[in-house]
Swiss-Prot record:
GO terms for cellular component: proteasome complex. This is Proteasome-associated ATPase. Pathway: Protein degradation; proteasomal Pup-dependent pathway. ATPase which is responsible for recognizing, binding, unfolding and translocation of pupylated proteins into the bacterial 20S proteasome core particle. May be essential for opening the gate of the 20S proteasome via an interaction with its C-terminus, thereby allowing substrate entry and access to the site of proteolysis. Thus, the C-termini of the proteasomal ATPase may function like a 'key in a lock' to induce gate opening and therefore regulate proteolysis. InterPro entries: AAA+_ATPase, AAA_ATPase_domain, ATPase_AAA_core, ATPase_AAA_CS, NA-bd_OB-fold, P-loop_NTPase, Prot_ATP_ID_OB_2nd, Prot_ATP_ID_OB_N. SUPFAM superfamilies: P-loop containing nucleoside triphosphate hydrolases (SSF52540). The gene is arc. GO terms for biological process: modification-dependent protein catabolic process; proteasomal protein catabolic process. It comes from Thermomonospora curvata (strain ATCC 19995 / DSM 43183 / JCM 3096 / KCTC 9072 / NBRC 15933 / NCIMB 10081 / Henssen B9). The lineage of its organism: Bacteria, Bacillati, Actinomycetota, Actinomycetes, Streptosporangiales. Pfam families: AAA, Prot_ATP_ID_OB_C, Prot_ATP_ID_OB_N. HAMAP family: ARC_ATPase. It comes from the Bacteria. Residues 586-587 are annotated as: Docks into pockets in the proteasome alpha-ring.
Amino acid sequence: MAARDDAGARKAQHDAEIHDLRSQVSMLEEEVSVLRRKLAESPRQIRVLEDRLHETQAKLAAVTGQNERLVATLKEAREQIIALKEEVDRLAQPPSGFGVFLGAREDGTVDIFTGGRKLRVNVSPSVDVSQLKQGQEVLLNEALNVVEALGYETQGEVVMLKELFDDGERALVIAHADEERVIKLAEPLRGVPLRAGDSLMLEPRSGYAYEKIHKAEVEELVLEEVPDITYEEIGGLGPQIEQIRDAVELPYLHADLFREHKLRPPKGVLLYGPPGCGKTLIAKAVANSLAKQVAEKTGQEGKSFFLNIKGPELLNKYVGETERHIRLVFQRAREKASAGTPVIVFFDEMDSIFRTRGSGVSSDVENTIVPQLLSEIDGVEGLENVIVIGASNREDMIDPAILRPGRLDVKIKIERPDAEAAKDIFSKYLVPGLPLHPDDLAEHGGSEEATIEAMIQRVVERMYAETEENRFLEVTYANGDKEVLYFKDFNSGAMIQNIVDRAKKMAIKQYLETGQKGLRVSHLLAACVDEFSENEDLPNTTNPDDWARISGKKGERIVYIRTLVSGKAGSEAGRSIDTVANTGQYL
């Protein structure tokens, strides 16, 4: 009984185990089935995961680039913030002042000038005090201490140097309205050669002069080397040349004889006469001749200076400027003359500036200009090497005090050329070597000299003939007398030169048109006619007497002028001078 019970129990246990095993087999089969399904699905999931990996990597790269851009933007923003902060800090700083360095002290402080005050201040360690120069600009902080060295002032007033003191650091200058002031020379002017009359740039607040100014009107008065003009180049003025040589060259070249005879050399010479007759040429030739005479006398290279001053360029609208220019002219002349060099001061158009005092219409500037010249001429007395030469075609308008003996002692009239003088002038322009027409040469045996001489003779006879075709003007004097004036009465060296130039131009045009080369007497005669015809309308002033005086006609006052020439096409003879409309130069 008991055995049956045990067997039944073992069987039941065995059945339970079999059931469990079957359950496990079933579960394993299901698990195997699941695994098989998963195994079948694995490649697809791998592909999905790979796609997701690639997508994630792309997103990561984009995020990385964006992050780098953000980093750069943040860095740039940080730099901008720093720069803005610096700008804000800089703008918030108090203003820096400027001062002028005056000098250094032994205790390390320096003296400066700023804001109209002289101050003694400290210096930043970054500034080398030993390198600071008087007059130099310095930068100041809020406490007015020097923190930086700068350059020199470049703006200021222009003043004229009157005297340089012995210490070489100070000078006496003349400002506007002839105000005198003592100033100091800044470092850039130390050692620069300065002389009275120089223009300086002054900073008026600090009292330092920084620069030498080359003013244009002063440069125009600088002494010029003498042009290469000789007496031989001047025609028709032999007697006048001899007079001026006696007045100028003899006293300079033979000063010992003049001292022995107790003869005072003339201080000046006045050359007067009609326009275009050689006054300026003579003055230049005098300087050139002096240089050559000095070279012959001393055996060394001769040198002289010619200071050509045109009257109108001296005039200045500011009071006192014209007088300053006159002082400057004579001061420069004295400087050159003190070296033993002859200096000629030549005033051209002297009547335009040194008129008779009281004759002015509006400003009467001559009331101060004339006395200035008189004092300068009188000051030349002690200088042997300065000669004053004046030129004018209206000597009657020059102040009598200038013309009196002791100032412009010698007065030389430059006359209009007569026939012989005209031949001499023509010979200066018609010289051997010019191309002459073969026909004209053949008439005189092929001789250039004979041909030119004959040409000159023909054209001079044409110019100086008192014929109907040479009648120019009929003048009526105040007493009622009338006189006919011919072109020869208004001839000049300048007109002769113009005639020769016209003839040469005609010869050139003929050669270009016909191929026939050379100057002919017909060219000279035609040029003479053209020159006369052009002069028909020139006497155009409404005051006949003034025009006559400028043209060299003196004597009875002229009240009426009538033209007699009818050289131009369309012009009529016998017109009153008041009806002439065209303008032109004086004859």
